[in-house]
Amino acid sequence: MNMIRFITIPDFADYQVTLKLMEDYVNKVISDHEPEIIYLVEHSEVYTAGTNYKQEELLNYGDIPVIYTGRGGKFTFHGPGQRVIYPILNLASPNRHKDLKLYIKMLEEWIINSLNYFGIKAYIIKDKVGIWAKVRKDEFAKIAAIGVRVRKWVTYHGVAINISTDLSKFSGIIPCGLENSLITSLNQLGIHVEMSEFDKIIQTEFNKIFK
């Protein structure tokens, strides 16, 4: 098995610059010029809209830029304290499957297992996209968002996990189109972890799921 490289982009990355980087690399993977890769990013503040967005779900964005992307999903927020993971994987390669639903299920399992390592019980909730953590009895809050795109069976975009994110920024949108849904982070759940430590665990857990 070839180990996939994880590349950490330094500082707070501009979303549009990162999107261009992803798209260029996807083209290289499609052309068999480059191997699979996973980018680890912490963005400067930005609201992004997926292909299923509704404009009324953008409530009050203030001076935070809004970017309309080609990923699946609706509005979300990216900013400091959030680990964004962009796997660029070739689902057409012999060791993978041309199955987008399976890929998303594997992403979910990967993130759930990574959160479990830190003592956070995370869940998938029917008809609600993303990864959810229990915050009170029978009450759940979203801790990670998922939005992907595939071109010629090569994946891009990915997952955003709230580590120490300023959760007040989510009030400028209806996150993922889910009205009245709570948003949480590792910090809010009492788990204080350095981004570098979190990255080590997601790399370990990735290799258990994406063999």
From Swiss-Prot:
Pfam families: LplA-B_cat. Residues 32-211 form the BPL/LPL catalytic domain. Signal peptide: none annotated. It catalyses: octanoyl-[ACP] + L-lysyl-[protein] = N(6)-octanoyl-L-lysyl-[protein] + holo-[ACP] + H(+). One of its GO terms (biological process) is protein modification process. Catalyzes the transfer of endogenously produced octanoic acid from octanoyl-acyl-carrier-protein onto the lipoyl domains of lipoate-dependent enzymes. Lipoyl-ACP can also act as a substrate although octanoyl-ACP is likely to be the physiological substrate. In the reaction, the free carboxyl group of octanoic acid is attached via an amide linkage to the epsilon-amino group of a specific lysine residue of lipoyl domains of lipoate-dependent enzymes. This is Octanoyltransferase. The lineage of its organism: Bacteria, Pseudomonadati, Pseudomonadota, Alphaproteobacteria, Rickettsiales. The gene is lipB.
